[in-house]
């Protein structure tokens, strides 16, 4: 039986180099699978053709934009998904979807192996391989960039040596990953933490200092799902795309951070995620109005744990599924409208309304006629601090 390797193909340096290498190593055939996740830029037909030019026997392009938005971006919105309270999981949420389609392609096209172009330093190797082992443990996994110690310089030199049709060169050494949820840039001069990002690094966002006129917007939610923008019904994908355009024009969603990778090292990453940041900001504001205090407090911890699970490549793990169920249950009343102003790199919420709101004006107002019984407060304060009062009394007496 001829070996057949199903490769997660991006069209970039690492996976283009992987095609002839995999064919040589296995003595078999390579099937390239590329997903359209709304990354824009290069036409997907060009990507498909490049894989064939690099030696793939088949090259498959799958339009997965709506699936990505509905099944991966939307759960991230509901979970207010931010790793280290900053990173909206741009690459992390795309990997389990790519894994899903690679496994399906392997079953359909007689694949014996699956492969990716990730190095041994990154998180993506974990996300891919844990996913493969969860969904199709019978498939063998090959990671040529990691297992054969390919550095970027070696990969570029090899590509030039055999005239692989790739755009990357020694003058442009960045690793870029992008989809409709955002864009990630790493390596190159960014590896020196003191070097500031240059303007040409950014693609999804305008310079926040340009001084574009403020953009006021109303985002409507139904059970945690963005369903309308300025009163116009939208799908989840359309909501992300529109917010990418409008928030991106205001320079929203730029992030330069040093993150703690799963493999134990720290890595500098530059992200752009205008739509993600704007939608999560609005969703969080809607939750603040509609979710009860103790549930909201607990959910913040669940959201953080959910983000860690996803970042760590555990999308298909039992804990992640259980966290999904909890988060989904909290979204029942997350319905209403959020108005916010986007300007100079910031989203500022300035209006909230919901038929499910827990905000009671008569209780909250300080004007005459409020219904809050302040006579209850004195006893509440005494009881609230009673245990710490007793503990401190004991400690003073013991001194």
UniProtKB/Swiss-Prot annotation:
A molecular-function term among this protein's GO annotations: ATP binding
Keyword annotations of the record: Amino-acid biosynthesis, Arginine biosynthesis, ATP-binding, Cytoplasm, Ligase, Nucleotide-binding
Which pathway does this polypeptide act in?
A: Amino-acid biosynthesis; L-arginine biosynthesis; L-arginine from L-ornithine and carbamoyl phosphate: step 2/3
Where, by residue number, does ATP bind? 8-16, 117
Where is L-aspartate bound in this sequence? Answer: 119, 123-124
Look up the record and report any one GO term of the cellular component aspect.
cytoplasm
**Which positions are annotated as binding L-citrulline?**
87, 123, 127, 175, 259, 271
Q: Where in the cell is it found?
A: Cytoplasm
Kindly give the InterPro entries that the UniProt entry links to this protein. Answer: Arginosuc_syn_C, Arginosuc_syn_N, Arginosuc_synth, Arginosuc_synth_CS, Arginosuc_synth_type_1_subfam, AS_cat/multimer_dom_body, Rossmann-like_a/b/a_fold
Q: Which Pfam families match?
A: Arginosuc_syn_C, Arginosuc_synth
Where does the UniProt annotation place the signal sequence?
none
The catalytic activity, as recorded, is: L-citrulline + L-aspartate + ATP = 2-(N(omega)-L-arginino)succinate + AMP + diphosphate + H(+)
Q: Name one GO biological process term.
A: argininosuccinate metabolic process
- Superkingdom assignment: Bacteria
EC number in record:
6.3.4.5
- Provide the family line: Belongs to the argininosuccinate synthase family. Type 1 subfamily.
Q: Which HAMAP family match?
A: Arg_succ_synth_type1
Q: How does it assemble?
A: Homotetramer.
Protein name, please? Answer: Argininosuccinate synthase
Gene field: argG
